[in-house]
Design a protein with these regions (language model features):
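Secondary-structure boundary/capping motif
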Residues: 98, 165, 271, 350-351
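N-terminal Rossmann-like NAD(P) cofactor-binding subdomain of oxidoreductases
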Residues: 2-203, 207-210, 241, 330, ...
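NAD(P)-dependent Rossmann-like dehydrogenase/reductase catalytic/cofactor-binding core
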Residues: 319-369
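Structured loop/turn residues at secondary-structure junctions
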Residues: 14, 94, 161, 247, ...
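C-terminal substrate-binding/catalytic lobe of Rossmann-fold NAD(P)-dependent oxidoreductases
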Residues: 8, 17, 31-82, 181-186, ...
Length: 369
């Protein structure tokens, strides 16, 4: 598709942690220019640097290009914002039904929405996409536009940030050798709760064995990602059963998962080497299209023989701008076919970076024109 040289974008929820991450990612983007920053009514009308103030949690400074930008009202300026931009990224902290309604208002104002929120993840005609795994789900968008009565407006969402740490590893193998069931335990960073050690001192030297709603999301959402378009909806898969337990751990960024899994046909399961080769060689559509935020190698592999103490969060989370997945310790299991570990950067691959990559996929395929 012949694209425009530049697309104007808005960030809805610009003062929150994911919103801040969007700003740093889009600041020097080759295709996109930040045109609008929007947040709650209490931030509206202020310069961005004053609205965000001490809440700025990124390592880098607030980019000069947005520091003095006047923040718009995310809920009351929908039509104004829609006129100014080609599409918006949305990461707001509101009640679920309010988010659902807000995102539909933007879509109906003919402004595509790439959402980091969970509100529309189970709307049957809203694609929930990990760009390397199920890019074909964008083909549901014409059906969604028909329902919304729009020409170009639509909503596309990314999955929960925990999924990136375990689903890619299984999904790539599942394409060739169907996996039947898996047991997953996730060890999730505090930035997933929008916090830092400064704002959540209780997490220092602590571990919380519970994250509200997270286990259900982690078990249910993979079914939609692995589902198929049938008629005017995405029908979730019922093939791969995942059981999950989630922990909040004292780590700033990066979600890790311990995974036990078994194949439908265990007698003819692939070898450890074969699985590791599938991971290392896998190229998805983002790699084929060479999208700006696509990691050169989607899955980085550490073998049990050569690097049993890898992947470690501190080093692995930064690979390819935080967009790569790292897998290691693949070995035979006594109760399952195999066991392994996998990790990803939860606010880059798992949140803002994954949403930017999804926007790039949609742009390259002509959905933003």
């Amino acid at each position: 598709v012949k694209m425009k040289d530049n697309y104007k974008v808005g960030i809805i929820g610009a003062t929150g942690m994911v919103g801040q991450r969007f700003i740093t990612l889009l600041n020097d983007h080759p295709w996109y220019t930040i045109e609008v920053l929007a947040a709650s009514p209490r931030s509206a009308g202020k310069a961005y640097k004053d609205a965000v103030g001490a809440k700025w949690a990124m390592d880098e400074e607030i980019p000069a290009s947005v520091a003095d930008m006047v923040v718009m009202d995310a809920t009351n300026d929908v039509e104004k914002i829609a006129e100014k931009v080609d599409f918006v990224f949305c990461a707001v902290d509101m009640k679920k039904d309010e988010i659902k309604a807000l995102e539909e208002r933007y879509a109906k104002a003919e402004c595509p929405v790439v959402s980091n929120n969970s509100a529309h993840r189970h709307t049957p005609d809203v694609p929930m996409i990990i760009p390397e795994i199920n890019p074909q789900h964008i083909e549901i968008i014409p059906a969604q536009r028909e329902r919304l009565g729009t020409k170009r407006g639509f909503i596309a969402v990314k999955s929960n940030c925990s999924l990136q740490s375990y689903l890619p590893a299984m999904a790539v193998v599942n394409m060739k050798y169907p996996i039947d069931h898996a047991l997953v335990t996730t060890y999730q960073a505090i930035s997933g709760a929008g916090k830092t050690f400064k704002t959540w001192p209780e997490m220092v030297d602590n571990l919380i064995p519970y994250i509200g709603g997270e286990e259900m999301k982690s078990e249910v959402e993979p079914n939609k990602v692995l589902g198929k378009i049938e008629g005017k909806e995405i029908v979730p898969s019922t093939e791969l059963q995942i059981e999950c337990q989630t922990y909040r751990v004292p780590v700033s960024n990066g979600h890790t998962a311990a995974i036990f899994f078994s194949f439908k046909d265990s007698a003819n399961k692939p070898s450890v080497e074969e699985i590791e080769k599938m991971w290392a060689e896998y190229k998805g559509v983002p790699q084929e299209l060479n999208l700006p935020h696509a990691p050169k190698q989607f899955i980085h592999v550490y073998t049990e023989k050569d690097a049993p103490d890898q992947p470690q969060i501190k080093t692995a989370r930064e690979i390819d701008g935080g967009m790569a997945i790292s897998c290691g310790r693949l070995r035979e299991s006594t109760q399952y076919d195999y066991k392994m570990v996998s990790m990803s950067h939860n606010t880059l691959r798992g949140a803002a970076g994954g949403a930017v990559l999804l926007a790039e996929l949609l742009t390259a395929k002509g959905y933003m024109d």
